[in-house]
Amino acid sequence: MLKTYHIALACVILAVVVLLFGGESLSLEEWQEVCLNVKNHFLHNEELSSLSIIILEIRLPRVILALLVGASLSGSGVVMQTIFRNPLVDPFLLGISSGAMLGVAMAIAVVESNIAILAFFGAILASLAVLAMNRVLGNSVLSLVLSGVVLSAFLSALAGAIKFFVIPQKAQAIVVWLLGSLSLSSYKDCLIAFIGLSLGFIPLFLLRWRINLLSLSDAQSLSLGINPVLLRSLCLVCVSVASALAVSVSGTIGWIGLVIPHVARLFFGANLQKLLLSSLLMGAFFLLLADVVAKTITPYDLPVGIATSVLGAPFFLWLLFRTRGV
C-alpha cells in the first residue's frame, strides 16, 4: 500500500536524479570535483567552478522551485475541491491565473520589470474581487463559482488586448509566461514560493479536520459547531496567497490543481487528514517530472505548462473513464 513517506522518498530520488543527469549528465569524477569545490567554496571561499555554478545556480533552484510550486498548486486544488464539494474545481477558479496574467501583461508592456510583484498583486486583487462579488451575491458556492468564471473571462480579455497591441517581442514574453516556465528559476523565486506555501498551508494543515466537515452540507457543518462561511473564506484566503505567490514566479501551470487531488484520493481516500499532505507531495513530484519531460522531449526547453497539459489531460480522461467503469 502506498504511504506518504513513499511519495516523499520518490521526490528526493527524482530530485537527485535531475541534479545528476539533468540536461547533461556528469561523471563520478566530475561530481567528486563539484562536491569538493562547493565544500571549499563555503569553508575557504574558493571560487566556484563552471560545473558547480551549473549545479548550484541553474539545476538546484529549478528543482526546488518545481517542488514548491507543484505542492502549492496541488494542495490548493484539494482544499478547493473539498470546500466546494466539487471535483472539477481548481485553484484558478478564483481568477488567480487571469489576474496574474493581466499583471504580467501590464508589467511587460509598461514597466518591463517587477513582473513577479505585479503578477502577485494581480492574482490577489482578482481573488479579493471574486470574494467580494460572492459576498454581495449571498455567499453561496454557486455564486462564487460564477463570479470566478466571469471575472476570469474579463481579465483574460484585458490581458489579450494588451498582448495584441504590444510589439512582437513583448507579446512573445507574455505568451511564454502564460504557458508556465521554470527556466529562469532563482533562489529568490524559491523563497517567494516557500513563503506562499508556508503562509497558505500551515493554517490549512492545522485546521484540516475542520475543513473535512465542509464536505458536508452547510446545515450539517453548523450543527457540528463549524461556521462554514467563515471557515470557507479563511480557506480561500490561504489558497489565494499560496497560489498567487506560486503563479507569480512560475507562470500559469495548469492541470496540477485539478488532476493530482484525484490521484491522491485513489490511494488515500477523501479524508483531508491524510489527503492534504499526500496531495502536496504528489504535486511536487508531478511538476518536477513534468519539467524533466519538458526539457528532454525536444531539443528546446519547452514551457513546463505544455508538459503538464500533455501529461495531465489524458490522465484525467482516464480517471473519468475509470470512475464510470468504462
Curated annotation (Swiss-Prot):
Keyword Magnesium: no
Protein name (Swiss-Prot/TrEMBL): Probable iron chelatin transport system permease protein HP_0889
Gene Ontology molecular function: transmembrane transporter activity
Location in or out of the cell: Cell inner membrane
Function as written in the Swiss-Prot or TrEMBL entry: Part of a binding-protein-dependent transport system for an iron chelatin; probably responsible for the translocation of the substrate across the membrane.
Membrane topology type: Multi-pass membrane protein
Swiss-Prot/TrEMBL GO biological process terms: siderophore-dependent iron import into cell
GO CC terms in record: plasma membrane
Lineage: Bacteria, Pseudomonadati, Campylobacterota, Epsilonproteobacteria, Campylobacterales
CDD domains per record: TM_ABC_iron-siderophores_like
Family that this chain belongs to: Belongs to the binding-protein-dependent transport system permease family. FecCD subfamily.
